[in-house]
Amino acid sequence: MEGGKGPRLRDFLSGSLATWALGLAGLVGEAEDSEGEEEEEEEEPPLWLEKRFLRLSDGALLLRVLGIIAPSSRGGPRMLRGLDGPAAWRVWNLNHLWGRLRDFYQEELQLLILSPPPDLQTLGFDPLSEEAVEQLEGVLRLLLGASVQCEHRELFIRHIQGLSLEVQSELAAAIQEVTQPGAGVVLALSGPDPGELAPAELEMLSRSLMGTLSKLARERDLGAQRLAELLLEREPLCLRPEAPSRAPAEGPSHHLALQLANAKAQLRRLRQELEEKAELLLDSQAEVQGLEAEIRRLRQEAQALSGQAKRAELYREEAEALRERAGRLPRLQEELRRCRERLQAAEAYKSQLEEERVLSGVLEASKALLEEQLEAARERCARLHETQRENLLLRTRLGEAHAELDSLRHQVDQLAEENVELELELQRSLEPPPGSPGEAPLAGAAPSLQDEVREAEAGRLRTLERENRELRGLLQVLQGQPGGQHPLLEAPREDPVLPVLEEAPQTPVAFDHSPQGLVQKARDGGPQALDLAPPALDSVLEASAECPQAPDSDPQEAESPLQAAAMDPQASDWSPQESGSPVETQESPEKAGRRSSLQSPASVAPPQGPGTKIQAPQLLGGETEGREAPQGELVPEAWGLRQEGPEHKPGPSEPSSVQLEEQEGPNQGLDLATGQAEAREHDQRLEGTVRDPAWQKPQQKSEGALEVQVWEGPIPGESLASGVAEQEALREEVAQLRRKAEALGDELEAQARKLEAQNTEAARLSKELAQARRAEAEAHREAEAQAWEQARLREAVEAAGQELESASQEREALVEALAAAGRERRQWEREGSRLRAQSEAAEERMQVLESEGRQHLEEAERERREKEALQAELEKAVVRGKELGDRLEHLQRELEQAALERQEFLREKESQHQRYQGLEQRLEAELQAAATSKEEALMELKTRALQLEEELFQLRQGPAGLGPKKRAEPQLVETQNVRLIEVERSNAMLVAEKAALQGQLQHLEGQLGSLQGRAQELLLQSQRAQEHSSRLQAEKSVLEIQGQELHRKLEVLEEEVRAARQSQEETRGQQQALLRDHKALAQLQRRQEAELEGLLVRHRDLKANMRALELAHRELQGRHEQLQAQRASVEAQEVALLAERERLMQDGHRQRGLEEELRRLQSEHDRAQMLLAELSRERGELQGERGELRGRLARLELERAQLEMQSQQLRESNQQLDLSACRLTTQCELLTQLRSAQEEENRQLLAEVQALSRENRELLERSLESRDHLHREQREYLDQLNALRREKQKLVEKIMDQYRVLEPVPLPRTKKGSWLADKVKRLMRPRREGGPPGGLRLGADGAGSTESLGGPPETELPEGREADGTGSPSPAPMRRAQSSLCLRDETLAGGQRRKLSSRFPVGRSSESFSPGDTPRQRFRQRHPGPLGAPVSHSKGPGVGWENSAETLQEHETDANREGPEVQEPEKRPLTPSLSQ
């Protein structure tokens, strides 16, 4: 697909017509292609667009759609495939489609298509062109207009309503263009009578007809011209293009007589219908009043019945809740057992979790240690390899620097020899004739020039030696740097290079002495000195310009990446020196005519060294040729030098050439300003050198000689002739020097390119270094990922331990939520029943409003009021729905609050458990403290005994010991007595303390028993809460299901109300249009009667013109048929050429793809080679690392032995954990005791359930007794309904009699009919289709209403005459289909009903619950009988469960059915004892 066709196809396929047409695939049986479309969407967008467009343009889908629109038109929906190819059957399908569509417009819709027929050849053989897209768009527009005017238009309108609003608006505009005759697309064949039209309207009609005829004539001319062109292409020798000689108008004038007759007939028919409708209006008003009174009475009765139905539903809900509670008991027991099992598993998981935590901690510590050692070894290896590479690079660069230095010295020697030769030639050329006064000054000038050359050479050698020393210092600094840095690859770390680069611009001062000295001589010596200065300048400049040739002599300089930037300051001096050239070249042409122009370049030249020497010969050439060449010739050369300059701009960090080229444009002005500032600084330096006495002596000599030469007088004619020849020779030499300068400039450019290549190589190396660092970082990240994986595993183990707690918390939260939701359940159901009643009332009211709107024209106001009331009720229902949503949100918030409360309860429970553990720990601590205190008391007693012994010993050695020995023995006895007394006292104190500690221990044991009792109570409470939560969860699920049903019903009601509102708007628009048409017809009748004669005359003229046009049309048609055959052959050749072109394009695409694949493979091959080199280098590194890792492995084995020791210690700790597990088993025994208590409670609940079942049987017997009363009332209601049906039948027969009398004259088209007659037929059909004998007639309660109309809902097509093709479509088939669907549902439900006993008549089953779907039956499906007992099927005095379920179902059916029916006002309400 070409580039221009893609957007056009995309716009067309995203438009409204294509969206509508492709969406009809599901209606015509092509929905199975959806999977293919999804596969196409996954392909490339152009191919997907082509496939979707070709699916539309092949005509198969459109023919199927047209088969639904016009099934009885010409031929069936036949599709021809496999003729000569896809293009041929595409042309055949589209031709067939166009013929059937044109016939449908002309025969069925009485419309003539004015738009030209589509170019079928373009659509068939070039379907992707813009012309084909436009032709297909026109066909789709006509198909859309036919779909909304056919018999099955409701089907297509529903499809259009299912699209987006934007697409609907666009489709509405397209439908308006196609369906309105005045839009220029179609023309009405049966219009009003020209005599009945006003003059203005008649003139407008005639103008539109003339415009249509002229358009048709233009299209005919275009078609004839195209046919002639095709004939010329087919047979260029036989046929010649013939211009259309005449252009008679061609149009549908032969239909004008038919239009006039149709208009008159329509006017008469409208008058007759107006009279009939006026009579019908009076009759229908009386009927409407009676029906309104009846409707009011029925509403009151329905309200009374709805209250009783609500009470019955409440009773039924209570019984269901009791049954569900009884059925949840086994499930609660099973949940309790599962919870206990999960508790045991949780304890086992906890112990395993602790073991895993300890083990993972040890593994993490060892892993961290190993990672640190590995990282240190990697860093050392990296530093070692980097330092080795840097040493090798520095050695190679040092050798290159020595080689460059030798080459530079050799070049300096050559330049000195060339300068001497040039000096000798200059002397010979400047020698005056013998005897002239100029010999003395020339003899004095030669030594000064030689001295200058030697001084320049010496300065150059000094600068080279200084640079050599600086390079050696830089090398030493680089060798002394640590291995972690990369001085060669990272430019910002090259700090030692910066002083060299800063000093580099100052070196050219030595080279500028000689030209500056000559300039100074020129300033002081006058014009004669200027004749001497140019040769000297040329010699010096030539010597300085040939110096840059040295770098080219060594072709191996490009091997080092940063050689030109860091190790060769000469290149850095040469490369940026062209930046100042624009200043010199701009000033030199301005002063080319004067001989003192040398002052401006010398004073303005920037201090950039050899750059000024390169540019000086050009300036000198400008002086010598200034009288002949214009100023404009030098300006391009200057600008060329300026453009070369910024490429070599110097800088301390040596930026790459790519950056300099990017900055070339905006930095030119800055280069000029900086060049001027540097020039001023350089002038100051040169003035300082000029003042040097070593330069002043030869200068004074030359000045004296020049002055003598100037003042001696004019030069003879021979000297002038020789001077002219010498000037020519000098010019030639200057030209040679200029060429040499250009060659040097080229060499500088080559060096610049080499520098760029070196910079790129350095960038590549830096990228490789970055890649290596990234690989290292990835290795670190992998290690971190492994650590994170271990942490994740630990978290997963912890989550497994916390899963039980979270599950229990969620279950408890659901319990609380469902408890809150259960309180609102009844309110929901009450609201739902009320909404259902309101929706049914709204349905009936809408149907009544629709029937009144279609039958009576003057009931528009009353319908509007009814509609407003309905909208108000709908808004109230929406508000109620919003309130229910708010309540639901409130319930959700309460659920969240209950969950929070449950969490708080769990936290309190945990805190109590922690408090219990704390008390145990406290008791143990107190016991330990008591033991320690007892030991301390014993120690104190021992210390006191020792003190007493010491005192006794001191007393024995005191003054008492000095007495007689007789006193020693009594004192010893006394001390022993005192000591015994103290020991007894201390023992008594210890006994008292022991008794106190035993009392505290008993008190703590009592507290422990109370805490255990509270823990048991909390466990019981948690179990009860779990039971309550499960019960509330079931209630919540029931409530959610009911809420969803209510929401769905509310949405259905809103959709129905929207559809009713839309139909009302349509009917109102039709009524207003009919009123306007009636008024317009009355006016047109008065106007057209006056102008009928003139129109008849014009009609005769138009008929004559029409005959002439028909003759011309027949001739053109014959020629068109001849040309069509020739065109088919030409188009077949075009198709073959197009296929060949597409094949060639595919070959070209395939060739380009292969070329791209080849380039990609080459790049991958290069990259693989580079990777192979890197891998070989890394392999050597890894071999070194392997030796280190072996040593580490030995160390790790030692650490492993240590870890095994630690694991032995952990096993001992696990034994302690086993002891704690034994304590947990005791707790499990307590839980088994609780289980036995729970089973006892379950047995009590079973007894209660049996009692409830007995009560339920009693309630069922009462309901059977109340059933007789209900059926007696039902018979009375049926009698009243029969009376109402008889009255309604009389009204229907009266309406039929009126329509038989007032039936209008049938139209000539037999396929159209009156939808009102069809409706009356359907009103009469229920009488013929009676119910079965001996029972209640099915659907009899709605026989006379509009709800009983319509056929089966599967066809969605009209019945009776419409099915045969002889009837007209009814304005409300959708409503009839819905009402018939309701009747069929009721009939099927009544047929599937089962009898309870023979004494109850057959009625309709409940629509709220299907058979086998009640809560009781679901309960019986889960449990075979009450509490496991078998189901009783007997019909004796003991009513079984199944019969009771049927009785309840029938009772629900009658309660729901008797709501909208008629009943007596005196009927008593149901007794409150009714329960289900």
Swiss-Prot record:
Listed Basic and acidic residues bias regions: 678-690, 825-834, 842-866, 1448-1469
Main location: membrane
Bias (Polar residues) ranges: 572-586
Pfam families the record matches: HOOK_N
Family: Belongs to the CCDC88 family.
Annotated function: Acts as a positive regulator of T-cell maturation and inflammatory function. Required for several functions of T-cells, in both the CD4(+) and the CD8(+) compartments and this includes expression of cell surface markers of activation, proliferation, and cytokine production in response to specific or non-specific stimulation. Enhances NK cell cytotoxicity by positively regulating polarization of microtubule-organizing center (MTOC) to cytotoxic synapse, lytic granule transport along microtubules, and dynein-mediated clustering to MTOC.
SUPFAM superfamilies (UniProt xref): Hook domain (SSF116907)
Topology versus the membrane: Peripheral membrane protein
Upregulation: By endoplasmic reticulum stress.
Name of the molecule in the record: Coiled-coil domain-containing protein 88B
A single GO molecular function term of this UniProt record: dynein light intermediate chain binding
Start and end residues of each stretch annotated as Disordered: 427-451, 509-706, 825-866, 1323-1476
Tissue expression pattern: Expressed in endothelium (at protein level). Expressed in NK cells (at protein level).
Coiled-coil blocks: 253-481, 720-1303
InterPro entries: CH_dom_sf, HOOK_N
GO terms (BP aspect): cytoplasmic microtubule organization; cytoskeleton-dependent intracellular transport; defense response to protozoan; positive regulation of cytokine production; positive regulation of T cell activation; positive regulation of T cell proliferation
